[in-house]
């Protein structure tokens, strides 16, 4: 999701998205640890998405 799309969401929606992404990251890490993860680029994408959501949440908290 693009940062501009994230900025249009409410804080509650962003927090829900963050929880969802953290759960997905956990699942991917477990798959990587057990050797089941085929598409390792997904870890990087999820980590980047988490950072984007946290950045927008910080922006909204300061505004």
UniProtKB/Swiss-Prot annotation:
Record carries keyword Hydrolase: no
Record-level Gene Ontology MF annotations: structural constituent of ribosome
Domain of life: Bacteria
UniProt cross-references to SUPFAM superfamilies, sorted A to Z: Ribosomal protein L29 (L29p) (SSF46561)
InterPro entries: Ribosomal_protein_uL29, Ribosomal_uL29, Ribosomal_uL29_CS, Ribosomal_uL29_sf
Pfam families: Ribosomal_L29
HAMAP family to which the protein is assigned, alphabetical: Ribosomal_uL29 (MF_00374)
Family label: Belongs to the universal ribosomal protein uL29 family.
Name of the featured protein: Large ribosomal subunit protein uL29
Species classification: Bacteria, Pseudomonadati, Pseudomonadota, Gammaproteobacteria, Pasteurellales
């Amino acid at each position: 999701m693009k940062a501009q799309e994230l900025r249009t969401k409410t804080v509650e929606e962003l927090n829900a998205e963050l929880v969802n992404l953290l759960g997905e990251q956990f699942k991917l890490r477990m798959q990587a640890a057990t050797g089941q993860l085929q598409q390792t680029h997904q870890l990087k994408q999820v980590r980047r998405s988490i950072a984007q959501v946290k950045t927008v949440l910080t922006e909204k908290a300061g505004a």
